[in-house]
Structures are given as C-alpha cells and as structure tokens.
Curated annotation (Swiss-Prot):
Belongs to the intermediate filament family. Residues 1-73 are annotated as: Disordered. There are two types of cytoskeletal and microfibrillar keratin: I (acidic; 40-55 kDa) and II (neutral to basic; 56-70 kDa). Residues 108-125 are annotated as: Linker 1. This is Keratin, type I cytoskeletal 23. One of its GO terms (biological process) is intermediate filament organization. Heterotetramer of two type I and two type II keratins. Residues 1-71 are annotated as: Head. Residues 72-107 are annotated as: Coil 1A. One of its GO terms (cellular component) is intermediate filament.
Length: 422
C-alpha cells in the first residue's frame, strides 16, 4: 500500500510598532484534509491555511489610529499585551496542530502498519524553524519599537529646537529693548548728574555770598570813634557831646534793626536751604538706584555680548567650512574648465584636419572626374583608331599622397603622380 503525505504550514505575519501598521494578516493552520482511496490507493494529506486578522482589527499608521492617542507608554503597553495574547493564540493553535498531526499519524499507522515512516527528523526541523520564525518576529517587533522610539525622540528634539529658536528670537527682541532702555537711562543719568553738579555749585556760591554778607554787616569789637574838634570859639562842649552821642545811638539802633531784619531773612532762606538737602539726598538715592540698574543692565549687556561673540565664532567657523567647500568646488570647476579647454582645442585640431581632408577629398574627386572624362575621350578615340587598325598603349599612373603631422596636427599634404611602365 503506497501512501503519500504532504504537510504545508505557512504562517506569516509582520509586526509594527507605533509608527507602522500590520502588513499582511497572520495565516493560521486549520484542520488538515485527508483524501484517501480504498484498496491501497494513494492517500494525500494536505494542510491549508486561512487568513485570520490580528486581534483588535487592522491597524493603520501610528498617528491616525485611535489606539495611539493619549499617552505613548500606555499605548505601547497595550500593543505589547495584544502581541503577547496573539503569540499565546499562535502557540495554542500550534499545539492543536501537533495534536491533529499525531492523530493523523496514528490513523495511518492503523491503516498501514507495515509502511511506517519516521518523520521525527522533519518534525524537529519544522519545530526548530518555527521557533526561529517566532524569534525573528519578536526581534523584528523590538527593532520596529526602537525605530518608533527614535522617531519620537527626533520629534521631541525638533520641538525643543523650535522652542529654543523662538526663545532666542524673543531674547534678541528683549535685549534690543533693554539696549534702548539703557541708552535712555544713560541720557537721564547724565542729565541728573549735570543737574546735581549745578545745584552743588549753586550751593557753594550761596554759602560764599552769605559769608560775604555776614562779613559786611559784622561790627568789629574794637569799634572806635575818633572825634576831632576844631579849636574855635568856646561852645557848650557837654551839649555838643550829648548831641553826638544821641546821633550815634540812633545810628546804632538803626543798624541793629537792619541786622535783625537781615538775620531773619537769612534764617528763613537758610531754613529753606536746609530743606533742599533732603531733596538732594532723595535725588542722590535715585541716582544710586539708577546706578545699580545701570550695573545690572551692563551685566546683561556683557552676557549678550558673550552670546553674540559665541554666535559670531560659530558663524566664522561655518563660513570657513563652507569657504573650504567652495574652494574645493572651484578647484573641481577649474579642473573641468581645463578639460573643456583641452577638448575644445582637440575639437579645433580635428576640425582643421577634417577641413584639410575635405579639401584633399574635393581635389581627388575633381581629378577623378577629369580622369573619367579623359578615359571616356580615350575610349572614343580607341574606337575610331580600331577602325584604322592603330594600336594605342595606355600608361597607368599611381598617385602618392604624402602627409606630414606635428604633435598630431596636419601641417603638409602633397599629391604626387607616378607613371607605371609596363
């Protein structure tokens, strides 16, 4: 009894991570079909596969699928759980397939116990290959997950770069505004310093003027009155002295009143001046505050200058690098230009040679035409002379062309005719 067994099992699947999708569906083995015949006929055992979509339906791209919305870690965990459940189903189906194969082998052993064949080696090879396929699929899934993680990292870095670029632009705008503010504060500080200096000078002048006024109105302690009396007729000396004393007392009282009035006025003025130093101190406090602000702005300005110098260094490095590349490109272009110039010279030389050869060809064609006419004329003369029984002997000629070239260029061409004697 002859029997044939053919086993076909073609599971195939492709796994993709968050950035990809399921390629083609996994094919699961189903129950084998057995065709047999009575009376020792051939038995054919075949396994067919059916397509079974992966659990959870078909998956599209990672960005358009609803499964990938939300947190990326939760999505990847969900995908890993689905993959694990899918592999468990595959193992369960493989175990069911093995059970069916064992039942079929038992059935064949019962039908044909004499023709027992050992398929253990093939089964081991199949099992080993199936394990390799599963390992390859797992490795493929891990690689795709790594690729998706790398893509997500690249997207994050691009987003960070865009944010840093926008932040840099904002800082540049803010630095420009701070520079304008610094210029305005410098102008205001200069004006305030000039105003304070003017007020100090005015205060010094007022003090000097006050001292001068005090010196003018000051009555010295050794004030003496010198009285000179002319010796004239004798008058009442006591009465005259009394009148003079009263007059000078009136003058002294008037001076005292004037001094009191002037003192009160100067006291009021000094009280006002005493109040003005508070204003000066407040302005000095403002000046100190402006100086601190100015120092802070100078620090920020130095920081921005350092950033600017770093960017200028980067720009110079980039320019030097691209200048080197440009120089290389210019060298390549100059090399190709030299080759093009040589090619043009070569074409000109070939064109000159072609013109010379064309002239020689034209000259030869003219000579051939002339010889043809001469030959035709000689043939007619030969016919006439044949009638008169005259013999004509033709003398053949050999044309020798001599060409002289220097450095590949044709400089001389001669055509010589040599008669060939019979």
């Amino acid at each position: 009894m002859n029997s044939g067994h053919s086993f076909s099992q073609t599971p195939s699947a492709s796994f993709h991570g968050a950035g990809g999708g399921w390629g083609r569906p996994r094919s699961f083995p189903r129950a084998p079909t057995v065709h047999g015949g009575a009376g020792g006929a051939r038995i054919s055992l075949s396994f067919t596969t059916r397509s079974c979509p992966p659990p959870g339906g078909s998956w599209g791209s990672g960005r358009s699928s609803p499964l990938l919305g939300g947190n990326g870690k939760a999505t990847m965990q969900n995908l890993n759980d689905r993959l694990a459940s899918y592999l468990e189903k595959v193992r369960a189906l493989e175990e069911a397939n093995m059970k069916l194969e064992s039942r079929i082998l038992k059935w064949h052993q019962q039908r044909d116990p004499g023709s027992k064949k050992d398929y253990s080696q093939y089964e081991e090879n199949i099992t080993h290959l199936q394990e390799q396929i599963v390992d390859g699929k797992m490795t493929n899934a891990q690689i795709i997950l790594l690729i998706d993680n790398a893509r997500m990292a690249v997207d994050d870095f691009n987003l960070k770069y865009e944010n840093e670029h926008s932040f840099k632009k904002d800082l540049e705008i803010e630095v420009e505004g701070l520079r304008r503010t610094l210029d305005n504060l410098t102008i205001v500080t200069t004006d305030l310093e000039q105003e304070v200096e003017g007020m100090r000078k005015e205060l010094i002048l007022m003090k000097k003027h006050h001292e001068q006024e005090m010196e003018k109105h000051h009555v010295p302690s050794d004030f003496n009155v010198n009285v000179k009396v002319d010796t004239g007729p004798r008058e009442d000396l006591i009465k005259v002295l009394e009148d003079m004393r009263q007059e000078y007392e009136l003058i002294i009282k008037k001076k005292h009143r004037d001094l009191d009035t002037w003192y009160k006025e100067q006291s009021a003025a000094m009280s006002q001046e005493a109040a003005s130093p508070a204003t000066v101190q407040s302005r000095q406090g403002d000046i100190h505050e402006l100086k601190r602000t100015f120092q802070a702005l100078e620090i920020d300005l130095q920081t921005q200058y350092s950033t600017k110098s770093a960017l200028e260094n980067m720009l110079s490095e980039t320019q030097s690098r691209y200048s080197c590349k440009l120089q290389d490109m210019q060298e390549i272009i100059s090399h190709y230009e030299e080759e093009l110039t040589q090619l043009r010279h070569e074409l000109e030389r070939q064109n000159n040679e072609y013109q010379v050869l064309l002239g020689i060809k034209t000259h030869l064609e003219k000579e051939i035409t002339t010889y043809r006419r001469l030959l035709e004329g000689e043939s007619e003369g030969t016919r006439e002379e044949s009638k008169s029984s005259m013999k004509v002997s033709a003398t053949p000629k050999i044309k020798a062309i001599t060409q002289e070239t220097i450095n590949g260029r044709l400089v001389l061409c001669q055509v010589n005719e040599i008669q060939k004697h019979a």
